[in-house]
Amino acid sequence: MLINNSKYYSLFLFLFFADLVYSQNSANGRIVDAKTNKEVSGVDIFINENQKPSLTTTSGKFTVQSDSLIYKLRFLRKNYSLESVDVTPQNASNIFVKLAQEKVGSIQEVVIHNEKPKYKNKKENPAYAIMQKVWERKRNNGLDKFDTYTYKEYEKIQFDANNLDSAFMKRKIFNKLEFIFNYKDSTASGKIALPIFLNEAVYENYGENRPSKRTKRLLTAQKTSGFQDNQIITLMAKNLYRDINIYDNTLNYFDIGFPSPAGETGFSTYDYNLVDTISIRGENAFKIRYQPKRTEVLAFQGYLYIDTDSYAVLGATLKSTQKINVNFINGISTELEYDNPDENTFLPRKFVTEIEMTPFSKKKTSKSIIAKRSVDYSEYQFNKPLEDKIFKRTEEEYNDKFVEKDDAYWVKARPDSLSKSEQGIYDMLDKLEQTPKFNRIVKLYETLGSGYYNITKGIDLGPIFSVYGKNQVEGDRIRIGARTYFTRNDPWRVQFYTAYGFKDQQVKYGVEGRFMFNRVNRFTVGAGTRRDILQLGVRLTNDDGIMARTFASSTIFARGENASLSSINQTNVFTSIEPWKNFQIRLDGTMQSIKSANPEGFNLMYYKNGDLRKTTNDSHFTLSLIARPGAKFSQTGIDRHEHGTLAPTIVLKYTKGVEGLFGSDFNYNKLQFLFYKPFLIGSWGKTVVSFEAGKNFNTVPLALQNVIPGNQSYSLAQNTFAQLNYYEFVADTYTTLHLEHHFNGKILSYIPLIKKLKLREIAFIRGAYGTLSDASKAINVEGFKYSAPSEHIYYEYGFGIENIGFGNLRIFRVDFNWRGNYLNRPDISTFGIKAGFQVGF
């Protein structure tokens, strides 16, 4: 396998996450009276945007220290004007401050001392009156007003390793890699920041609102830091950010809802304080400070800048609180600027977001990665005729040469010049790519990250995490697999596995090959075959393809004995295409024979024309329509990496069984539907909805029937019923609904002591209803055993605790499940506990 350059960036993050060391910021100087030049004592010194003084001086000299970077100091003393000094590496020592006297009682005193005025009710608060005007004149994105529009977008994404020091640089892991620190950048306090990734991109945006609504975002230029295949890290970085509208009630960060300070529901979360009137780009603006009423909630603090005449939002700063309860995140900071061409619309001008990420600790001194994304919007044009071909351009999106530009282009395209450290990133990562030691570390990291180990060029072994399993039929099971792998964007791939059970002493296998002819519409063909023991009936809407695996046939820990396994011999051919973005049409042809893998404990025998048969022979075609509107993917090859979004999944499948084709025993028609979607519910968290429905229109034996999916393992399994046994409910016609709400700690944050653990609560309810005809029961030898949840809707409910762990590493979840009805059945479980790992923010 070729070394995958895109993983260098991910490895770089991993290396800097590996060690945690302490570093401190400091500044010192002298304070005098501007008129007399005499030293002044009793001065309150504020660091950065802090609202409480970090020091009150006892003499004219001062020294301040902070766990975070000091970039600004503010000095305030009674009867003196506020003085602010920007701190840089050049002036951090021996800062000379002159304070000018003024009248007592200026508005700045109220602002800096954070003396929040006490009002009998919010209507007495002048900030409330201003925010009411903002809500009354709430603006819409101006792009929707025009028939057509175009604009230019410049995006810069940068990763910096932060809080480094000389001790960190001497770690053994950097032996023979010391040259990377020649590109370091020192902060004002002596800390070291090392730029490790830079991506620049220019987009042309086109839109048409009338007569039909169409948009096109075309990448016209891109420059990356060193490696050629950087797409996955670039899109991973972009996936950290979401497009936000400051007027919305909820702002989406990491698919977690934060209440907007400019939303109509803001006063339920924030306290507001009018602190000043300032000028922004020649416009007078109210400066309103806001902060959350409770620091334990997911919310921001910062400033809103409101036009004094039109009450439009000219800008905003959003900064997370110190107690932010988001995994792997130490802090979020966003600055927004808007243009307001008229009283009803706003246009984005500039967005800058910084995210500080650490793997384990939330201490400010921890080593971290600063991910910064800045976007500049310019060259707006409206109501100009747009040719139809603009919206049909696709080839350039898959052609790297189209976006290659020379240095002269980038000098002109950048709104601001690159810093010296940013310019050095390109050279540093080119050198790193040629270092043998780093490439060896890359290989180890790739193995842990992908689950595959490269043995020679283009061949990987794996997945290594699926080597061992256990079930009632096979006993201990060993599985070894391999795949072809040259690059992330391979247009073809062959996969193979073989497995052996020490109890049944049988060899199993599977092999599949796929080839993609066109990257634009992803026209793909594939074929495969397998002979294996599987747990059928754990999913209603199954994934098609030979290499799709089922968890239950190799579960190590389970509730009760699982004897309901099937021996399957299956061959599949398919073709698929995406005629529109994120909409796939797939046609499968499948030939299979299914029999019980444990005839003594699980009977799949059925009657056909009066004959008793133990093997179900089936040939069928399946047409699948799969829509994923809004989904994001990072590769263009046969296998794509999907990034987490709130995009829905909508699947419609029709299956036609053909009797007589390759010895098939049944004609049948089956229709299935699936809808899955996460929804943000403001500050109350996120609700995940999964709905499935289906119908078999003909009589088929148990091996081809719809099984309401149970879960007898102790692991979490999506879209299954935790308290159902396998094959407990079977249905010709079925509907299921899973509702799961993640509160993000909203309730537990009110409980003393518990709130310090930063646990998050989950509540869920699941239901299933279906019918099973007498004919479908009679066709099976043991049909009397099977029934559908037709008397009542079967339901189970419960709650869970997620975010269990320490520091920033909180990936464990435990669910407590109760069965709601059908309690008089034999061998059921009325209560159960499931646990598992889930990695996310």
Regions found by a protein language model. Name each.
Residues I95-N114:
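Conserved "repeat-terminator" motif of extracellular CCP/Sushi domains
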Residues I31-K35, T58, K138:
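Short solvent-exposed capping/turn motifs at the termini of beta-strands
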Residues I256-F258, F382, F391-F841:
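Exposed, low-structure sequence patches enriched in small/polar residues
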Residues N50-K61:
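Short, acidic Ser/Thr/Gly-rich low-complexity loop/linker segments typical of extracellular
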Residues I47-E49, R74-V85:
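A short, solvent-exposed loop/turn motif at the edges and junctions
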Residues N37-S41, T63-I70:
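Short Pro-Gly-centered beta-turn/loop motif in secreted/extracellular proteins
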Residues K116-A285, Q291-A299, S361, T365-G458, ...:
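Structured extracytoplasmic
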Residues Q24, G29-V40:
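Structural motif
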